[in-house]
Amino acid sequence: MASAGNQRFNDEAANWDKNPSVQEATRLAFDSIKPIIQTLAERKQSTTGARLDVLEVGCGTGLLTLRVAPLVREIVAVDPAHGMIQTLEAKINTPTCQEIAADGPRNNSHNVVPVCRLLEDPEDPALPALDGNDPTGRRRKFDLILSHLVMHHVPDLRAFLGTLFGCLVPGGRVALTDFEDFGPEAIKFHPPNKLDGVERHGIPARWMEDLMKEVGFQDVKVSVGWTLAKSVELWEGQKPGDTLGFPFLVCEGARP
C-alpha cells in the first residue's frame, strides 16, 4: 500500500471502529466467509484432527480477526499500518477483550498474533517460524488466508496474489473480499478527501478471476457475496443522506 494510505490508516486507527460503515462491512464479510472457514475446519479436523491455521493480510484493528479467532487454532494478523496494529494489540492485551464472535460475545484474543509488516515475501522473518526450535528457518504456511478491503489499495495485485499463494500449504485456500468495480460510480466508495492510497476503484470480477488463475490458483470462484449501502453524500451532485449500493466480491481459490 502507498505510504500516503498508510499514514491515513495510522491517523484513523484510534477511531476506526466507531465508523458504522466499517462495522457493517466487516459483519457482512464475516457472514459470507464463515461457511468457507467452517467447511475447511471440518475437513482438516476429520483428516488430521487439527484446527485451522489462518493468515489475515491487512487486518486493520482486528474487527474481522476477532470474529474469526474462535473458529480456528491461530490467526496471524498482519497490517503495514502501525497505528492499526497498536489498536489490535491494545484489544487483545485487555482482559475484558470482547468482540461479537460466531455465537456471541466471548474473550477470543488468546490465539491472535499481530504482526506489523507490509507482507511481500512468504518467507518474511516477521511471520511465525515453521519449527519453533529453528526461529531463523522456514516460515509457517497456512490453511486459509483472508484479506478484507485491502486489494483496492495494492499497486501490484499479481505480486500480492503471488505472495499469498506462497504462504499457503498445498490445498490451502484464500477467501478475499473487496468491493467490485461495477462502473464509474464505484469511485464513490471513498469520499473525495480519502482517495490517497486508493489504487483502483473496486475489483473487476472477470479480470480478478483470470488473474488468480494466472498466478496458479485452482478451483477459482469470484462472485458477489453481498451489497453494502454506503453514504455518498460528500460527492458533488449528491444530497445529504444519499447512499449507493456497493456489491462486494468474495474471491476464492486453492493452492494445488
Can you name each region flagged by the protein language model?
Residues 149-153:
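Short catalytic micro-motifs in class I SAM-dependent methyltransferases
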Residues 250-256:
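C-terminal lobe and adjacent flexible extensions of AdoMet/dcAdoMet transferase-like proteins
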Residues 1-52, 87, 94, 118-123, ...:
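Conserved class I S-adenosyl-L-methionine
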Residues 9, 20-22, 64-66, 175-245, ...:
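C-terminal alpha-helical "lid/dimerization" subdomain adjacent to the S-adenosyl-L-methionine
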Residues 146:
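A conserved beta-strand element that flanks and buttresses the S-adenosyl-L-methionine
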Residues 51, 141-142:
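Local beta-strand N-terminus motif with an aromatic residue
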Residues 158-173:
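A short glycine-rich, Lys/Arg-flanked "PGG" loop and its adjoining helix->strand segment in the class I
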Residues 52-130:
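Class I SAM-dependent methyltransferase SAM/SAH-binding core
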